[in-house]
Amino acid sequence: MSHSTVAQIKLKSGGMSYAIRLSEGRFILIDGGTSFEADGAYLYEYLCSRTEGEGVVIAAWLFTHGHLDHVALAARFMTVYRESIRIERSLYNIPVGIDFCGYDAKVGNDRDAIFEREWFEAVRLYPEADLHEVRTGEVFRIGDIVIEVLLSAEDRYPDPPTNRNETSAVFKLTFENGVRFMVLGDAMGARLAKLVDPASSLFCHEGRLQCEILQVAHHGLAVASYEYFGAIETLYRRISPRICFWPTYAHRFYNDPWCQDEKYIYNRFLLCSVRERNFHSSQTVEINTEDRTVTLLE
């Protein structure tokens, strides 16, 4: 296998998980999901099946933010498979010691803090790995892929975040053949709007945003208030994806108002205008970046 692939990994327990195989055989992983018990073995088996017997080498593991549905599986995975995998780098920006004053505090999301701590302990099991806190504007080249950081946690300063979604990083990955993959994580309305606001220091011109593959923001619920609906639709129009990854269950994708209700005009735009296909995360979807073929795996 001499070409790169990008896959949305099936999750039984919810969350978000992506695996990118570089043309030379190493991997870039993004987040991971909620439950190791349900999904960790599947991820390991998938990676092994794509190594051609060379062993699993993770060139970089990217993390968007610290909610448990993005870091819990990774924390256990790194612990259980310590002797079976090699991790060369972790790219993240997960603030610690923040008193979240909004949703996270209201619902008592102590579990998120627990799994954040487990994650920090797990990454330190790999002393040979480079642990790097990303900042907006940084660019990394890993194998044949360029990773740009478009948003990071500090961009909210001086306003305190009210929940972990407001610290989510946004990454753009560009493959050697020009295919681009936009990873919005759980970034929501006000932060995503800055990417299309000419008055913002975070503004990205239209050509910089265009990507063939899009990870739909926050599992299909990109904003918390109507005032940003227009900005999110503008963002999605400028990204202009051919393929959308929706990190959400099939049932939610087909039935939940988050994805289908007409009030979420930005989701309607994606469902009606995406030139190829929309994919939920109840099955693994793998894209060959050379010929753009799509493979569905159980």
Roles of regions detected by a PLM:
Residues 14, 36-37, 66-72, 96-100, ...:
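Active-site environment of divalent metal-dependent phosphoester hydrolases
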Residues 77-79, 94-101, 154-156, 196-200, ...:
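Short regulatory "switch" loops immediately downstream of catalytic or recognition motifs
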Residues 1-56, 127-213, 285-298:
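Core dinuclear metal-dependent hydrolase active-site scaffold
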Residues 39-43, 73, 111, 115-119, ...:
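Stable alpha-helical elements in mature extracytoplasmic
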Residues 37-92, 201-222, 237-244:
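Active-site metal-binding motif and surrounding structural segment of the metallo-beta-lactamase
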Residues 84-91, 95-148, 159-165, 240-298:
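Binuclear metal-ion centers of metallo-dependent hydrolases, dominated by the metallo-beta-lactamase
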